[in-house]
């Protein structure tokens, strides 16, 4: 059975409060066993994800979490910006703009801040390979004082 299809019912809640005490992040990261959840490498992954969220400010975990209404609004904005272009060109531009939107707003699609050669998704996949269990980011929340 592929790791990606296996259930993740264990895990930890990670937290990070920025040194200025004005930004805090909570994240739930799940894995298949308590054994992996207690592993230092897994804990490091969770810590790195909280730092990623603090620095890069994603709004959603994965592409599937982005509301269809938000995607439709983004597409309309881009279509309006490029309405004088031929339809085939608009489609290509739209595709690129939506990829940029995902990279800016979706945690798993973002460039990993500790290694800009890979995405957060690729970083997690590398840890799945090392730890031998499926790992899923379930949810996160970022708090900013005054926001």
Show the residue positions of the predicted features.
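N-terminal assembly/interaction segments in proteins that build large macromolecular machines
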Residues: 1-147
